[in-house]
């Protein structure tokens, strides 16, 4: 009776199946409703709330549009077209191979033996295949052929794509938020498929849009940062009721079957990619029978292929014991069992949560680039969370962050302020600490300054905020609403879901935070202060569907303040102590008014000027309308206050240490731009003013073609008493920085000339100036001058705007405090490069071509008291023969023959470190992996990305990327303390997108090295006094492949590169024995162990395959494998025997080129069949395709001849020719010693101009002429020439060491207006005339006085004579002549003044005549 009842029930059930399918199609409200409602104990298909699908599977099968893998291709796999590119593990794939063996593959899988082996540790690639694959359950399986009538089995697949990919509006015919899934796709013909996709497994209708939306909701629930991902396509593959490869009917009947699913999602740009794995049930552990798991063990993994790396789905001990545990556990326990999520686009990162306790498990943190100001939140995927416990995020060397459990897979942690720039290792653990075993979860967060934060608040054009008047009364404000959640709802996440739109409904306040560095009397120090001064506006965070990925755009009313947090007195006084500030958008708090200085987590903007707030509280500007007069009044008020603040800054800065002595002495600017380009270790392109980097938003130096700044804090040394001239003291960092700007001629621009050149504000002449606060900050990034970006704005940038932009006629005051460098103390670096196929120009100017595979010590500098230890290693590999046709694989060619090496080696990787720094690897990516990134930058075993931040700072290392060309092909690495820098260019930084014959770049690295002069390396290569100088100044021995002969002079520094320098045995073995790391060459090349290199302490560690102790915890990260192995790995067949490497010398190269050219151009060769056959074989193996073109295109360029011949690529040959010519020319200019007189200090620049205004006026031989405008006259010495001045001692003997370069002496030029000059001229004329008159009068007076004096003297003498005569008359009875007579011919003239005596009267006129006649006739008179 019981059996008959069972049969009746089964028959009824079978009859209800079609009806149930119709119900399922008509009402799909129950589809996926088990999410978050997992039935207890439900482990198998058909026993949950859905009759057909498991509790965790998406709908599959023919009724939803799936196609089934062809039974004849189940084992080998059926290849399908994806119709767009999907990224996976660094590669891009538009196809996939689906196999019954539980994988989605992208290459042929070697399936011999019981176990499918993949990955670096299990395969012998390239001798055997190592395919890339997504393997939910990799082991040998089968589709049972003899199933009972009630059971189905197969591998199903479909491709879901958005309608918008085909020009249709997404969601135009669907109701989001409701379950409208309809299974009406079955039987669709190819003609009705998506446009351009003839396969019927492709869906691009409303059902596909709905499915992709559902997958996004799943990802948001389980993956940190998935809210930023928008799925546009998905590949769904379902393995339904597969059985073990070795299984019988009894095994199948007993339920030893497996059902699982893989969903691979990507966006339309193929940038992001996620995989969701669903395990419904797993009935076997291996491809064995009778539940035996000793053979053909099943694996769940992601393999990058070609030894790129392997990531297991579950790296726990439970999985090793039994892989079936995947169906019982989950990476998202809050959703359903058996579900795991991964991000797989570039490197596979596990998402969701894990139950791993010991060892190391990488956390997924979003965002992992965080503003150092803190007060932000990050989402963390780590351990599977329990809401009853408290979890913390421990930050290396900093305080912990409190975390809130959002779901069982995601925790949200509130970060404090972390004043640091660089990577901090973080650990995620329960609060109970040592009471638990969860110590495995390790991650990293990169803290950045606010000026470089890629997630900063978008406030429009930042430079509009620094204009007076502001160009607009409102400014834009843009943010993504999904970055904010309701702070009240986050405390009750057990009641809401992550994809609930109400979670993102909140009120946001826009706050102004002012910054200054002030004296804190409590700690007796100056420290930074961040003060919330007001709230400008309040906005509602939009949470509707369209704002999931669409940004919210609002406007900021600049002259309206919603709430002040300063009283009236503070607004009138303290507000002007804050030179600048920034905006922060954060959710409102209920008690915001009681504690306004504490804000919730939010987004901050770039620094802005606060001058728009100066008039917001002023009553004279409190008008309801805005007019032109109001704008002018505001502008004048800002000018007035800026003038006061400029003077305050001038006085404040003048009271501080004169840092110019440090910047000019220890970081003097390069004299010409080519020196700045070559000096990689000390100077770098300015992040906002560089033509080469295509960023010229430099408002403080408009007019300069390129600006460069010191790539580290200015290093200085002890300068006190007791220092000897030959002492080489240790250097220590300051908090200063140097900025050098160059004009279009490559000459330095000078601040002293700015007032005489910049006639109007629009004249493009704004030189660079040194900075008291280095823009990139100073470790430990905590105190005054040390906050990156903010300290620079407070001490340097904002004073420039106050004095030079806002106030009038105060720019010279600023430049008095910030004078530019005159390059008088600059010494050029030693500069070398390796390019192409091993063409070297060393740092001491030796030139040669060296080829030999292996890892070499490129540069080694031992540690001294004054310099750190520096280690640079390069990896050279044999370049593959690109004439190999990959399409022959599997027919005429084996896997090991795909990579056939040539006899030319290229650099494929470089690694460097110094004392106390992180270890940095820059390696080229493998073939077929260079689509998005052409190189990999690995710091401390962690792969770093430079998509949003092209300047990144690590421990003692600065790395920046020129992202003009796609794929980060140009990387700069600077060791800060050592001041040694390298430049890495992949494939000459060619724009591969424009080359139709190349699908990806070539994988060749060019390495340029710059060594500063403190190491004693002469750039000209003269080593005559090398030993003497090294001993006298205690200099280290600099050696390596970039300086292979430090103790001997090769003489090649005086010559150019010739064919005799190509793999010459005179230096080959010396380089190999001295600098190659043991064990890194080809097999058999290290038979004779040579310790010659160890005599000088050369490193023996291979830094590509080893890790430092502090980095070993990250060795489990998949990128650790990317740096270890070669990128052009060959099979052992090509490393021994006739295929092993042998160097080609210049003579052999020349002979083969001549032979091949003769074979190409000699028509008689083809006339003899036997000779034609022999020459054909020779030409195929030894000749390039067009040898005559090589000789013609290359000419006498040896690097071009060598690379063109070996690579058989004209593009590479011509590029190395151009690179070599450019390098030699630039090196000659960069290594010269330029003599500088500095600049002429102009103190009174009114109406003065320089002729020619932009010409160089600081180098030896330069002439500077100054003139006045036509309204003024010039005075002083107005022509100067820079020349050498030799000092002579007292014996007039010239000392050749005692000289200097100076301008000629003279009074400074100055101008006087013509009106004033005319006035003074007329005044001088009038004064002259008046002076002449006065002079004449004075002369007359002098003469009159003299005359009167003489008259007086005459009168006295006459009175004496009269007295004498009177006495003589009285004694003798009279004179010779009577008194009334005179001497003959000397008639005495009548003088009234003479005869004033009352007793004497002159005689009558007649008596006088009578007397005269008497005298004439009576005396003997002689005339």
Swiss-Prot record:
Q: Which residues form the signal peptide?
A: 1-28
**Extracellular topology ranges:** 29-1321
Q: Which residues are glycosylated?
A: 94, 306, 355, 483, 666, 903
Extract one GO BP annotation from the record.
Answer: cell-matrix adhesion
Q: Which residues cross the membrane?
A: 1322-1342
Q: How does it sit in the membrane?
A: Single-pass membrane protein
Where do the segments described as Disordered lie?
1364-1401
**Can you list the GO cellular component terms from the UniProt entry?**
extracellular space; membrane
Its subcellular locations are: Membrane
One matching Pfam family is NIDO
Every copy of the NIDO domain together lies at 184-347
Query: Could you tell me which residue ranges are on the Cytoplasmic side of the membrane?
Result: 1343-1423
Is the keyword Signal in the record?
yes
Q: Which residue windows does the record flag with biased composition (Basic and acidic residues)? A: 1378-1401
Task: Report whether Signal shows up as a keyword of the record.
Answer: yes
Record's PANTHER family?
Answer: MUCIN 4-RELATED, PROTEIN CBG06057
Instruction: Name it.
Output: Uncharacterized protein F54D1.6
Task: Please name the source species.
Answer: Caenorhabditis elegans
């Amino acid at each position: 009776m019981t059996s008959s009842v069972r049969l009746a029930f089964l028959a009824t059930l079978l009859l209800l199946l079609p009806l149930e399918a119709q119900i399922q199609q008509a009402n799909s409200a129950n589809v996926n409703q088990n999410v978050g409602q997992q039935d207890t104990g439900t482990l198998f298909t058909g026993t949950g709330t859905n009759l057909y699908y498991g509790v965790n599977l998406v709908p599959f099968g023919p009724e939803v549009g799936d196609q089934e893998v062809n039974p004849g291709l189940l084992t080998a796999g059926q290849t399908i077209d994806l119709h767009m590119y999907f990224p996976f593990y660094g590669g891009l794939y538009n196809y996939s191979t689906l196999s019954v063996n539980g994988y989605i593959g992208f290459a042929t899988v070697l399936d011999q033996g019981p176990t499918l082996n993949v990955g670096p540790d299990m395969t012998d690639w390239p001798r055997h295949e190592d395919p890339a694959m997504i393997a939910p359950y990799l082991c040998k399986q089968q589709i049972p052929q003899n199933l009972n009538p009630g059971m189905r089995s197969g591998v199903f697949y479909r491709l879901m794509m958005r309608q918008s990919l085909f020009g249709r509006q997404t969601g135009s015919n669907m109701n989001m938020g409701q379950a409208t899934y309809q299974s009406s796709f079955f039987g669709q013909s190819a003609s009705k498929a998506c446009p351009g996709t003839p396969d019927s497994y492709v869906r691009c209708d409303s059902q596909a849009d709905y499915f992709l939306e559902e997958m996004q909701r799943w990802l948001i629930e389980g993956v940190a940062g998935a809210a930023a991902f928008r799925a546009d396509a998905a590949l769904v593959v379902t393995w339904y009721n597969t059985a073990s490869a070795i299984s019988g009917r009894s095994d199948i009947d007993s339920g030893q079957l497996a059902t699982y699913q893989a969903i691979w999602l990507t966006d339309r740009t193929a940038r992001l990619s996620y995989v969701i794995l669903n395990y419904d049930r797993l009935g076997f552990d291996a491809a064995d029978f009778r539940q035996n798991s000793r053979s053909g063990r099943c694996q769940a993994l992601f393999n990058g292929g070609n030894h790129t790396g392997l990531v297991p789905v579950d790296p726990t001990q439970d999985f090793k014991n039994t892989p079936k545990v995947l169906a019982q556990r989950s990476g998202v326990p809050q959703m359903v069992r058996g579900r795991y999520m991964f991000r797989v686009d570039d490197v596979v990162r596990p998402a969701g949560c894990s139950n791993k306790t010991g060892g190391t498990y990488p956390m997924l943190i979003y965002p992992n680039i965080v503003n150092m100001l803190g007060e932000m939140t990050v989402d963390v995927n780590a351990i599977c969370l329990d809401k009853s416990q408290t979890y913390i995020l421990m930050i290396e060397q900093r305080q912990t962050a409190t975390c809130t459990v959002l779901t069982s897979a995601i925790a949200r942690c509130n970060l404090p302020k972390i004043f640091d720039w660089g990577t901090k290792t973080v650990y995620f653990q329960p609060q109970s600490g040592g009471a638990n075993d969860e110590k495995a979860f390790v991650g990293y967060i990169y803290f950045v300054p606010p000026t470089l934060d890629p997630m900063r608040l978008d406030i429009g054009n930042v430079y509009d905020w620094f204009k007076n008047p502001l160009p607009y009364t409102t400014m834009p404000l843009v943010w993504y609403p999904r970055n904010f959640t309701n702070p009240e709802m986050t405390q009750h996440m057990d009641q809401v879901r992550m994809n609930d739109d109400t979670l993102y409904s909140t009120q946001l306040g826009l706050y102004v935070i002012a910054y200054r560095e002030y004296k804190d009397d409590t700690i007796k120090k100056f420290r930074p202060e961040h003060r919330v001064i007001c709230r400008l506006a309040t906005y509602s965070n939009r949470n509707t569907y369209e704002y999931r990925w669409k940004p919210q755009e609002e406007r900021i009313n600049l002259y309206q303040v919603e709430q002040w947090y300063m009283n009236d007195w503070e607004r009138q006084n303290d507000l002007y102590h804050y030179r600048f500030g920034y905006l922060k958008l954060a959710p409102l708090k209920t008690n915001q008014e009681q504690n306004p200085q504490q804000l919730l987590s939010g987004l901050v903007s770039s620094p802005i000027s606060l001058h728009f707030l100066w008039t917001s509280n002023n009553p004279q500007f409190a008008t309801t309308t805005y007019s032109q007069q109001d704008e002018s009044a505001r502008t004048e008020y800002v000018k007035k206050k800026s003038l006061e603040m400029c003077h305050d800054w001038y006085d404040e800065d003048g009271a501080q240490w004169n840092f110019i002595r440090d910047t000019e002495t220890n970081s003097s600017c390069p004299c010409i731009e080519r020196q700045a380009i070559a000096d990689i270790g000390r100077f770098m392109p300015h992040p906002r003013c560089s033509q080469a980097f295509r960023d010229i938003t430099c408002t403080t130096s408009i007019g300069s073609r390129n600006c460069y700044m010191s790539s580290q804090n200015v290093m200085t040394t002890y300068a006190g008493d007791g220092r000897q001239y030959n002492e080489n003291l240790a250097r220590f960092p300051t908090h200063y920085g140097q900025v050098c700007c160059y004009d279009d001629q490559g000459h330095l621009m000078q601040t002293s000339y700015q007032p005489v050149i910049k006639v109007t504000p629009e004249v493009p002449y704004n030189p660079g100036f040194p900075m008291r606060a280095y823009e990139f900050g100073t470790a430990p990034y905590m105190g005054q001058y040390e906050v990156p970006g903010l300290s620079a704005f407070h001490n340097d940038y904002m004073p420039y705007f106050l004095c030079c932009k806002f106030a009038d006629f105060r720019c010279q005051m600023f430049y008095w405090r910030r004078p530019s460098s005159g390059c008088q103390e600059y010494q050029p670096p030693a500069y070398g490069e390796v390019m192409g196929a091993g063409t070297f120009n060393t740092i001491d100017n030796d030139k040669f071509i060296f080829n030999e595979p292996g890892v070499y010590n490129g540069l080694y500098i031992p540690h001294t008291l004054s310099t750190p230890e520096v280690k640079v290693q390069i990896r050279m590999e044999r370049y593959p023969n690109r004439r190999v046709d990959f399409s022959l694989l599997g027919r005429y060619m084996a896997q090991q023959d795909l990579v056939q090496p040539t006899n030319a080696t290229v650099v494929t990787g470089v690694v460097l470190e110094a004392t106390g720094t992180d270890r940095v690897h820059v390696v080229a990516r493998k073939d077929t992996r260079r689509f998005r990134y052409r190189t990999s930058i690995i710091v401390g075993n962690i792969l770093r990305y430079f998509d949003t931040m092209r300047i990144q700072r690590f421990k003692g290392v600065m790395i920046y990327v020129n992202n003009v060309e796609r794929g980060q092909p140009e990387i700069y690495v600077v060791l800060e303390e050592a001041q040694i820098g390298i430049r890495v260019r992949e494939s000459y930084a060619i724009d591969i997108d424009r080359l139709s014959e190349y699908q990806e770049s070539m994988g060749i690295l060019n390495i340029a090295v710059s060594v500063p002069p403190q190491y004693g390396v002469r750039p000209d290569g003269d080593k005559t006094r090398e030993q003497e100088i090294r001993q006298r100044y205690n200099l280290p021995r600099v050696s390596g492949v970039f300086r292979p002969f430090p103790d001997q002079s090769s003489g090649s520094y005086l010559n150019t590169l010739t064919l005799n320098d190509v793999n010459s045995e005179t230096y080959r073995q010396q380089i190999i024995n001295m600098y190659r790391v043991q064990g890194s060459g080809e097999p058999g090349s290290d038979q004779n162990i040579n310790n010659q290199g160890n005599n000088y302490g050369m490193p023996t560690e291979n830094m590509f395959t080893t890790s430092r102790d502090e980095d070993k915890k990250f060795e489990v990260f998949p990128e650790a494998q990317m740096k270890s192995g070669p990128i052009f790995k060959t099979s052992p067949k090509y490393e021994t025997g006739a295929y092993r490497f042998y160097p080609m010398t210049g003579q052999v190269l020349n002979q083969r080129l001549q032979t091949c050219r003769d074979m190409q151009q000699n028509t008689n060769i083809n006339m003899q069949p036997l000779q034609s056959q022999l020459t054909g074989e020779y030409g195929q193996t030894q000749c390039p395709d067009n040898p005559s073109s090589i000789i013609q295109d290359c000419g006498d360029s040896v690097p071009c001849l060598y690379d063109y011949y070996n690579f058989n690529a004209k593009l590479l040959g011509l590029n190395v020719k151009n690179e070599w010519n450019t390098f030699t020319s630039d090196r000659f200019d960069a290594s010269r010693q330029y003599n500088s007189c500095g600049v002429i200090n102009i103190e009174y620049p009114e109406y003065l101009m320089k002729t020619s205004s932009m010409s160089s006026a600081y180098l030896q031989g330069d002439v500077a002429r100054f003139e006045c405008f036509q309204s003024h006259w010039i005075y002083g010495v107005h022509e100067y020439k820079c020349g050498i001045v030799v000092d002579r001692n007292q014996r007039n003997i010239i000392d050749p060491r005692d000289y200097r370069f100076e301008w000629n002496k003279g009074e400074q030029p100055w101008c006087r207006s013509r009106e004033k000059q005319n006035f003074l001229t007329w005044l001088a004329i009038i004064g002259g005339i008046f002076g002449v008159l006065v002079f004449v009068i004075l002369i007359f007076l002098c003469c009159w006085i003299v005359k009167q004096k003489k008259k007086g003297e005459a009168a006295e003498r006459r009175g004496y004579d009269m007295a004498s005569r009177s006495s003589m008359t009285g004694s003798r009875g009279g004179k010779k002549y009577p008194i009334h007579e005179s001497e003959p011919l000397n008639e005495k003239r009548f003088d009234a003044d003479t005869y004033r005596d009352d007793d004497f009267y002159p005689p009558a006129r007649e008596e006088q005549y009578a007397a005269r006649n008497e005298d004439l006739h009576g005396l003997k008179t002689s005339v």
